[in-house]
């Protein structure tokens, strides 16, 4: 499907959020990309690096006109963020995230959505030794796995838009139950990043082959 958003708002413009913004802008997938954060110097750097078009420090202002909101802050801040600005989202908006923990957080996020607003959980498995928007790259997600965690109530059109967005980043998109995601990621969390990523890729390939004995 052809993908284009009038406004994408990224809440938390660090390595992941900044890299996503760079891709959205380079590929023309959004008319404007707005960054939301608390540190103005970081947001100014994000503009200079091409990660966002403009920034605001008031999240309510930042999300009000957004077609898509990407929550790219630490997962332990999700509840605070959604409580603060979810009611400001326009009808038809989509909210997604990039967090490494799903499960209950996905359920909480869905409950926080106003009528007509849709949440789709996502976890791009990509990173670098360095963090922050200065380490961002429009190649960060190329060839990486991105796990999307829909539920029974996920809006199909919103799901497809989020899936397509991550495919546009060069990611290989995998769909998985949120709680199963947490079990698998928890099992590999003690491994070095390279080994963990390799194991996730192997599990994804097994799933893609649709082997009946493995419910992945």
Located regions from the model:
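NAD(P)+-binding Rossmann beta1-loop-alpha1 motif at the extreme N-terminus of oxidoreductases
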Residues: 1-65
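Residues at the starts of beta-strands that form the adenosine-phosphate
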Residues: 7, 32, 118, 145, ...
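Short beta->alpha hinge that forms the Motif I/post-I loop of the SAM-binding pocket
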Residues: 38-39, 73, 98-100
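Conserved short alpha-helix immediately C-terminal to the canonical SAM/SAH-binding motif I
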Residues: 42, 77, 102-105
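Rossmann-like NAD(P)-binding element
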Residues: 59-94
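Rossmann-like NAD(P)(H) cofactor-binding subdomain of soluble oxidoreductases
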Residues: 84-134
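Internal alpha-helical scaffold of NAD(P)-dependent oxidoreductase catalytic cores
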Residues: 140-216
């Amino acid at each position: 499907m052809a993908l284009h958003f009038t406004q994408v708002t990224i809440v938390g413009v660090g390595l992941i959020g900044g890299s996503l913004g760079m891709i959205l802008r380079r590929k023309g997938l959004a008319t404007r990309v707005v960054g939301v954060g608390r540190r103005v110097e970081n947001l100014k750097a994000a503009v200079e690096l091409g990660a966002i078009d403009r920034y605001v420090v008031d999240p309510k202002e930042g999300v009000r006109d957004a077609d898509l909101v990407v929550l790219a802050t630490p997962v332990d801040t999700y509840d605070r963020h959604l409580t603060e600005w979810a009611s400001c989202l326009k009808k038809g908006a989509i909210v997604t995230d990039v967090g490494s923990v799903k499960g209950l957080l996905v359920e909480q996020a869905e409950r926080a959505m106003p009528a007509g607003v849709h949440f789709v959980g996502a976890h791009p498995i990509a990173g670098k030794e360095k963090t922050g928007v200065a380490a961002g790259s429009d190649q960060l997600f190329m060839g990486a796995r991105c796990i999307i965690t829909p539920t029974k109530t996920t809006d199909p059109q919103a799901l497809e838009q989020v899936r397509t967005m991550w495919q546009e980043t060069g990611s290989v998109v995998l769909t998985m139950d949120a709680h199963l995601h947490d079990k698998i990621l928890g099992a590999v969390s003690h491994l070095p990043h390279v080994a963990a990523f390799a194991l996730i890729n192997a599990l994804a390939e097994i799933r893609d082959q649709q082997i009946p004995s493995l419910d992945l």
